[in-house]
């Protein structure tokens, strides 16, 4: 595990080429007045993501409108689809009289070549099902059909409780570890390396520890970095996880 404190745009070039299997990051959306909430230079960020990711690596990036549209537009060629995280709470109460409250965040998935994809929650069928080609379907199968061995394939709506206010909430936009574990297990295998270049309080790192993945985390804010460092040291049982620091 590597934890780096400093500006990710300065530290990303230090990460070796083609060394990362997945980027999982909650980028700044640029929709609040928080001092850290400024959209990163996307052209430069994508150049670094392409460099550090393996050819079949995936980037799963949290977003919400209007940032979602800007994020997809920043790399339309490699954008593939979105997951939609349905929270157990709503936001936007101050504007409830003029617009609907929100309970969804987007997770935009990008890749160049087909990545690792491990559908979660599959149930093996007692008896395989053969599906013959259907000439009336707009989705034509190649060859003579297919055999279905599993059911309960995931759809794009993911329902996970958010992190409630209290001692377990370390960051204002903290994401739930079970959701991050789900994404890590979907796009990587045990022993793979996951990068979070805006790690906040380190939730992605916790997910990686619990699922047996390697983790590289970068955080600019020193206070949040120290929270993440302490949290990950406690989770892993190891001290001195810091690999470098940029003033």
List each language-model region with its residue ranges.
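Core catalytic lobe of class I
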Residues: 1-218, 223-226
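S-adenosyl-L-methionine
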Residues: 1-12, 235-247
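Short functional hotspots where side chains directly engage DNA or cofactors
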Residues: 227, 231
């Amino acid at each position: 595990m590597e934890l780096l404190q400093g500006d990710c745009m300065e530290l990303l070039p230090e990460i070796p080429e083609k060394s990362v299997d997945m980027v999982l990051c909650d980028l700044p959306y640029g929709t609040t007045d928080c001092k850290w909430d400024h959209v990163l230079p996307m052209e430069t960020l994508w150049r670094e993501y392409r460099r550090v990711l393996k050819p079949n690596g995936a980037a799963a990036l949290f977003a919400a409108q209007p940032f979602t549209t800007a994020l997809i537009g920043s790399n339309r060629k490699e954008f593939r689809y979105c997951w939609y995280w349905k929270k157990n709470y709503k936001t936007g109460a101050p504007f409830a009289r003029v617009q609907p409250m929100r309970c969804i965040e987007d997770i935009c998935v990008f890749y160049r070549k087909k990545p690792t994809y491990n559908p979660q929650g599959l149930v093996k069928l007692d008896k395989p099902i053969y599906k013959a080609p259907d000439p009336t379907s707009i989705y034509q199968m190649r060859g003579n059909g297919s055999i279905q061995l599993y059911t309960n394939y995931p759809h794009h709506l993911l329902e996970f409780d958010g992190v409630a206010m209290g001692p377990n909430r370390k960051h204002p936009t903290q994401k739930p570890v079970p959701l991050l574990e789900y994404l890590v297990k979907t796009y990587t295998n045990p022993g793979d390396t996951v990068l979070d270049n805006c790690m906040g309080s380190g939730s992605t790192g916790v997910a990686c520890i619990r699922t047996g993945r390697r983790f590289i985390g970068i955080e600019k804010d020193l206070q949040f970095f120290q929270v993440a460092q302490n949290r990950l040291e406690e989770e892993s049982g190891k001290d001195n996880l810091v690999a470098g620091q940029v003033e």
